[in-house]
Amino acid sequence: MWTRRWIQFLVLCLHLWVTVEGYLGVFRGDVNETITLSCNNVTELTAWFKDNNSGVVLACDGENSSDGRFSRINGSSLVITMLQIQDEGNYSCSKCSEDKSSQAYIQLKVSSGPYNVLADISPTRTLPNGTIYTSVGSNLSFGCSSNSYPAPDLEIVLQRTDANPEPFPSIKGNNFLQFNLINVASNYQGNYTCSAVNPLSGRKLNSTRQLLVYRPPITSIKCYANNSLGFSKMLLSCSWPGGYPDPLLQWEQDGKIIANESFAANTKDTLVTYLNSSSLRVRQQFQCSGKHLSTKENNMKTCQIQIDLPLLESQPMRTCFTGENVTLSCSVSGAVPSATITWLRNISDPESDIQPGKKYLISQKDSLSYLTILNCSHEEDEGYYTCKAENVLGIKEINVWLTVNKPHNIVGLVTALLLLFLLVVAIITGTVLYCDPQIYLKANPFRSGATDVLVLVDSEDEENEEVFDTAESVQYTDIVPNVPPPAANGHLSKHEVMFHRPPESTSSDLFSEVSDDTGEENQNEEI
């Protein structure tokens, strides 16, 4: 029961609001459009007022306003042409046959735009086709603006070629949006769309700018020269990879630009051209210039090459024993473009290159070439071998002489030398012993423990001086009496030195007595 009464109450309130207040709703129109306001389906003549009767838009006695933009249709509906923003407001209508107490109210809203939508990205540089670009690592400011009434809702969206749209900051009810990006990366390249939406009309307008994010090449510019087309032409190759977009490359010869040729080897980051060998000279210089849009306009990168003949080095002579292997080497330096190395046998066939096979092995490491001759033969292999280096400028050659010898009996030679050495030692030893046999006696190892007795015999005075050394296991021997007669002048003419071995039984006292007696005799002789 209460629910039923409550519903009846709401219906009554709505009826009173419609009849008493007379609110007819909201009308919306765009600038410069024509809109018709209906006065609650009234068919008789009505008057129109704006903003709480403060201004008469269309009186009962008139069909049109003074400016002609307001008119009455069907006696009750108000027609507004060339709608303007200032026309927005609250309108009321009333029957001319009644007083103003019974009025119907209408709210008119006017929208404009959006228009003049602009997406701005700065600082950037512009290509001839109008596309803007920047470099990796730059700081950019993004702006989005629009004219609209009421103020629009603004948004910036990034659309990459290989990803879903990425929204950026947005703002509602404002005519300008701005944000900054610091240290821009390569993945921020794409189309930036500034979207402006009129919140009243829902009308949407976009402005799109394509932004390219360039990056310089990651490597330095490099130049090459080669003989890939043969020795009649020289290829010049200039490469500067890793950048976006592709660099601009140009070859120069002695300050003059070389016309670019179309080659299959030409790529976006490599420029290849060729020159005839007849136009080349030793130590001629070439330069490749590279320019990239990510760098400053005057910041160009260059590389130079100087062409030259090869320089050869090798051992002039080599030796090989019959049946063994030998390796000849040849080094090349200074050749630009690089030289091709071949080996020739200038005795058997000087015009034919040596080919690898059962007899020869050829290998090359960088600028070194090796020729290995297997199973050397004096008849076949001895002689000159030629190392030839050739590039587009010319040919250089160097000769190596190979001598093939028979192997020697090394063991027999060593044995002969050893026997000769032993013979010389034996001869020297025999000669020494023959000239002075006492050397052997003194050096006799069996007498190392003996003590010798030295006896001095005075032939003139028949006096003996004996010096004894203590010893063990020595046999005693008497003085030999055969003494020559004294000299006529009374002087001592000769001494004899004799060694004796005292017997083991001789005591030390005997040696002391002999020493004392000898001393006394010497004193008497001095007196």
From Swiss-Prot:
SS bond list: 144-194, 238-288, 330-387
PANTHER family (UniProt xref): NEPHRIN, V-SET AND IMMUNOGLOBULIN DOMAIN-CONTAINING PROTEIN 10
Organism phylogeny: Eukaryota, Metazoa, Chordata, Craniata, Vertebrata
Transmembrane segments: 410-430
InterPro entries: CD80_C2-set, Cell_adhesion_signaling, Ig-like_dom, Ig-like_dom_sf, Ig-like_fold, Ig_I-set, Ig_sub, Ig_sub2
Gene Ontology MF: a single term: cell adhesion molecule binding
Extracellular side: 23-409
Compositionally biased region (Acidic residues): 514-527
Compartment(s) of residence: Membrane
Region (Disordered), start-end ranges: 501-527
Residue ranges annotated for the Ig-like C2-type domain, each copy included: 14-111, 123-212, 216-306, 310-399
A Pfam family the protein falls into: I-set
Entry GO CC: cell-cell junction; plasma membrane
Protein name in the entry: V-set and immunoglobulin domain-containing protein 10
Membrane topology: Single-pass type I membrane protein
Signal peptide segment: 1-13
CDD domains: Ig
GO annotation terms (biological process): cell-cell adhesion; synapse assembly
Keywords tagged on the record: Disulfide bond, Glycoprotein, Immunoglobulin domain, Membrane, Repeat, Signal, Transmembrane, Transmembrane helix
SUPFAM superfamilies, per database record: Immunoglobulin
Spans within the Cytoplasmic topological domain: 431-527
Residues bearing glycans: 32, 41, 52, 64, 74, 90, 129, 139, 191, 206, 226, 260, 276, 325, 346, 375
Major localisation: membrane
